[in-house]
Amino acid sequence: MKKLGLLLFPLLAITLMLGGNAFAQDNSTYFTTYYSNANTSGAPDATLRIINDGNTDANLYADIYVFDDSQELQACCGCVISADGLLSESVNKNLTADPITGIKPQRGVIKVISSQSSDPTVISQFPGLREWSTHVQKLTSGYAMTETLAADSNLAPSEADLLSMLCSFDELLSGHPCTCTQEDQDF
């Protein structure tokens, strides 16, 4: 019995050490959120806010991919954010103003990759961005706004390849990417 305990103790210690490393890894490079009631008469505009946490003391890029509610890419762009900087993007004016289909979407999904590359067709994940967004909620009379932290998501290689490919097609077909506001300024 004592031999079994001596054998299991090192295995348990190794498991805990390796498991601790897995928990310490930073997977905050891919974020997802939604938008609703965009480009809707009488509804307020929603905002996507992204900060560079300054941990790397370097510029990072928010590679942004905007989908409609039919899961079709409508726009993509790469926006620079300096260390400790803030990027504020209007859903109506920056992200859905010039969609590839020509029809401004009212709801859909926004995906953001924290990247070292300004080109959203080149996936170069690098942690350091954080994202929040406001959401326009329809009420019986009028609209209400809520704000949430974007979901910290897992970016599979197949999803990264798909985003890169779709954005390449968007650039080839429309030539009109979403636009970036100047950092630390609202639209």
Can you say where each PLM-predicted feature lies in the sequence?
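Gly/Pro-rich, tryptophan- and cysteine-flecked surface segments typical
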Residues: 22-187
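Bacterial N-terminal signal peptides
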Residues: 9-17
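Short, intrinsically disordered low-complexity segments
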Residues: 1-2, 15, 110, 129
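Bacterial N-terminal signal peptides that target proteins for export
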Residues: 1-9
